Every structure is written in C-alpha cells, then in structure tokens.
Amino acid sequence: MAPSLLTTPSQALALAPGAAASRVGGGGGGSARVSFPSGRVQRRGALGMRVRASVAIEKETPESEPPPTFLREDGSGAGSGSVRERFEAMIRRVQGEVCAALEEADGSGARFVEDVWSRPGGGGGISRVLQDGRVFEKAGVNVSVVYGVMPPDAYRAAKGEAGKNGAAADGPKAGPVPFFAAGISSVLHPKNPFAPTLHFNYRYFETDAPKDAPGAPRQWWFGGGTDLTPSYIIEEDVKHFHSVQKQACDKFDPSFYPRFKKWCDDYFYIKHRNERRGLGGIFFDDLNDYDQEMLLNFATECADSVVPAYIPIIERRKDTPFTEEHKAWQQLRRGRYVEFNLVYDRGTTFGLKTGGRIESILVSLPLTARWQYDHTPEEGTEERKLLDACINPKEWLDL
C-alpha cells in the first residue's frame, strides 16, 4: 500500500490519534524501550476491532501489546540516539505517567483501556481512554508515530522556496518528500463543573531526503501546547496553571510565555461564537528557529509540566458541591468544545476528511454536551464572568 500523502507539513500529526495541529518525558538520550508507571492498563484484544482507512493513510493493524518502539529499523530509528528515538521514548513515558496520575486522582479503581496499533510501512500508536470514572467523565491520552510522504510543493513551502509547476526556483521538478511525525495528544474531561477540562499535545515532525535528491537537507519542526478550559473561573486555579506554563517557558526563553500565550488565545478561537474555547495556556507550531536539542528539551519540559499544572487543581475541585444549574452550564461549555474541535481544529477536521482512525480522532470530544437555544448568562453571574473572559482574553499573571 502506498504511504500517506498529505497536503501540508503541519497536517502530518492529523494522522495521529486525536491529534490537533497545535501541540513529552526525560530529556536526553536513552533507549526507545520504555516502561509504563501504571502497569494496570486494560488492553483490548485485536479480534473484533474494526479499523478504517482511505487512500491517504495505511490501514492500521491491531496489536495485543505495545512494541518496544514504533520506529523503523534504519539509521535514524531505534538504537540511533536520534531525536526521533528520544522523542518517542519521551512521549511514551509521559503517557504512562499522566495515566497513572489520573487513575490515582480518580480514586475509583477505574483503569485506562488501551488499544495498540501499527502500520505496515512503519509507525503505530497507543490509545488509552478512561470513561465513567468517579472524577473523570472521559480522559484520553494517545501517542503515535507516523511515516508517510508529502507533496514536494508542501516541502518547498516549508523551506520558503518559490517555484512553478512543481519545480523549485533553482532546480528541476522534485518528487514526493518522505516524512516522520510523532506526538502525544490528550484531552481530560472531569465530571465536576468546578474542575476544568485540560488539553495538551506535543509533536515532532521531520523530513527525509527525496529519492531523487539524496543530498537534500532534512527539515524538522516542533509543535505543541497545553490549555485549560474551565466552566467557572477560580482565579487560584487559573493562575496556578498559567504560572506552571510560564515557569516551563522561562527555563528556555523569557519571551516564550507571552508569545505562546497569545498564540494559544488566537488559535482556540470559535469564530462563529466570537469566543475562545477556554482560558488559554501556551501554543506553538512549526517551531524550528532555535537549536534542535534546546527545543527537544523545551517540549519535554512542557509535557513534564502537565501533571504539576493540572493534578493539584483536580484534587482541590473534584469534590466541590455543585447544583443541576452548575452542571447544565458545564454541558453548554462542553458544546463549545465540540464546536471548536469539529469545525476549526485542523488535526480533527483533516483526520475526518482523510479516513483517519475515527475512535482516536474523536476521543477529544466529551462524553456528554448540551446545546440550548439562545442561551445567554445574566450579567453579574459567575457564568457571565467566564463568558466575558472567553470573549476578551486576559493576562492571568503579572509579567
């Protein structure tokens, strides 16, 4: 079967389970053989599991156990000490650590159900989902490794080259460009209206030289982000969340937090509502204008910040008393979440159009949501306070 064919580099992770075009473990070398802290994941058998594919991507094959690595056995794969290898090891470690922290916070004995899949041409993924826990209505944490091919014009556009009829400005027409992409993507929907939803996603993208241009330079990008979507504003929680993001950013460049916060506010914008999806966080995309090792460490730091940014908030709010009115408002805000993901999120929409793995693509959606005709919260209410903050993003920290 032919490899994947994408239209732009930033869409590569749309082939990954649940990926969005926004959006990670120890930062250093090491083997791609990783351990999972939870060790209690329920695995779904390969039999009876239906998969979906189209001409855009290879059909995935269910696996009963995660392999030591999803990387191809070539010079840039397993055992090479490459960024690819370290990034895969990182996202798989983070997946295990986040799932373990969520299971502990849930406290019900509920466990993540795991699906493992691979593709014949290399790559694969691990989808983990917890539903109907005591604390979490639905929580998905997915990792994936994708190999494919993108059109040469997309490759040249990423390099800033101009040309006509598929030809580079200074050379003959080039062939399709092989690529590698890996990422972790997660959305966490708690039951309590006072406990916020969290989304995070971190990814790495890299090209190989086309067959007809073996000496062509390799291109690479990092992308990612972590953002918070509460139904009610509890400033202690929002400030804590943003302060953890800022601390992670400041370790590498003090300009990162203000720059990536604004990027986040701009990206998660529901145009037809004139609202942001939530109260932001950080977001960056196609980042390659810094040292590669520095950005690998930065993505790692951001992913390692997920648990300390989120779990303390969950512990404070998971047992907060609430009313039916609070729950109804949460469901309305969940509706906004659905609208953004299905209408605007580039990874979700691309995955739906190209026959991606549907269960993984839609794992970001909440288990329940609500749409109420012409609903507007009254002035002076806590609900209105949240809506105003989504319409007019604010600075949560003194910079």
From Swiss-Prot:
Residue ranges, annotated region (Disordered): 20-39, 55-81
Pathway: Porphyrin-containing compound metabolism; protoporphyrin-IX biosynthesis; protoporphyrinogen-IX from coproporphyrinogen-III (O2 route): step 1/1
Record-listed substrate binding positions: S185, N201, Y202, R203, G355, G356, R357, I358, E359, S360
Site feature (Important for dimerization) residues: H272
GO cellular component, one term: chloroplast
EC number: 1.3.3.3
Residues annotated as transit peptide in the record: 1-52
Catalytic function, reaction form: coproporphyrinogen III + O2 + 2 H(+) = protoporphyrinogen IX + 2 CO2 + 2 H2O
Active site residues according to the UniProt entry: H199
Taxonomic superkingdom: Eukaryota
Transmembrane segments: none
NCBIfam families associated with the record: PRK05330.1
Assembly information from the UniProt record: Homodimer.
Protein known as: Oxygen-dependent coproporphyrinogen-III oxidase, chloroplastic
Originating organism: Oryza sativa subsp. japonica (Rice)
Primary gene name: CPX
